[in-house]
């Protein structure tokens, strides 16, 4: 698995936020955000800045349980934002989060939603990096700007998604969805500029590995497009073949953590 350093993540939280701000410079902040129905561009930026402040509080206070996320989800009042106010606020939140992470160090313990007890805050450094990356893509699309992403970041973001796809919430039976696991169910993801991964759904729980194998379904394209495809964002470079229904089901189940309003 690709693992970038804690320091790199702390840097990227700030630099990705700066790039996001550049995408929206001069843009209409009331423009709708396609990937986040009901939000406009200003609300998207409020969400990202709220995410950063939420994570900063968790890290700074070494929270041992969930922290209220009103700044992340309560966006109804932010329908007509002023970029001159919003962009500096967004930058400030990213810098505060990065500083809190550095002050804590990667091994300090705090709550996170993926663990049943306080865990190293390195989780938050990585998670907020890719939270910012994906919403930067949303902002670029809404503003008519070009989105690109460093290959190392894209690979790690893909593997973060694959990691989440092995959590129980991503495969345990649900009455409202078909079963995910079963005989012959393997997926192949071919990043034409980075590498390949196989997801095996034939056992008692999903597993993934790097490499190539015969599969029931394949998604192929540049690694950034595969990342956007996973997140159900427009990904014109991603092509799929085989059991598309299985791919769609896997994406829906693997993205269980996106079902909450904050993502």
Where do the protein language model's features map onto the residues?
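Acidic/histidine-rich alpha-helical segments that form the ligand environment
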Residues: 78-109, 121-131, 138, 180-188, ...
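Short, contiguous alpha-helical
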Residues: 28-69, 115-172, 226
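Short, helix-capping/interhelical loops that line the mouth of catalytic, cofactor-
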Residues: 1-7, 51-110, 146-158, 162-169
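A glycine-rich beta-turn/hairpin centered on an aromatic-Pro dipeptide
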Residues: 161-198
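C-terminal interaction segments
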Residues: 212-263
């Amino acid at each position: 698995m690709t693992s970038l350093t804690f320091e790199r993540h702390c840097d990227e939280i700030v630099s990705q936020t700066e790039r996001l701000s550049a995408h929206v410079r001069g843009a209409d902040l009331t423009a709708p955000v396609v990937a986040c129905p009901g939000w406009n561009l200003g609300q998207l930026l409020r969400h990202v800045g709220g995410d950063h402040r939420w994570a900063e509080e968790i890290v700074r206070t070494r929270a041992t349980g969930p922290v209220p996320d009103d700044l992340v989800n309560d966006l109804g009042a932010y329908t007509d934002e002023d970029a001159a106010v919003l962009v500096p606020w967004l930058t400030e939140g990213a810098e505060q989060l990065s500083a809190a992470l550095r002050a804590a160090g990667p091994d300090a313990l705090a709550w996170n939603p993926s663990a049943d007890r306080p865990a190293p805050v390195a989780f938050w450094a990585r998670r907020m990096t890719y939270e910012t990356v994906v919403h930067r893509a949303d902002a670029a699309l809404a503003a008519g700007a070009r989105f690109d992403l460093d290959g190392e970041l894209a690979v790690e973001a893909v593997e973060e998604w694959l990691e989440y796809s092995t959590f129980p919430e991503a495969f345990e039976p649900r009455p409202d969805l078909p079963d995910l696991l079963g005989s012959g169910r393997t997926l192949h993801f071919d990043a034409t500029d980075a590498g390949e991964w196989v997801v095996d759904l034939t056992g008692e729980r999903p597993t993934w590995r790097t490499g190539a194998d015969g599969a029931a379904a394949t998604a192929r394209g540049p690694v950034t497009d595969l990342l956007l495809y996973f997140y159900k964002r427009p990904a014109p470079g991603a092509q799929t073949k085989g059991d598309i229904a299985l791919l769609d089901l896997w994406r829906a189940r693997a993205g269980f953590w996106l079902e909450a309003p904050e993502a």
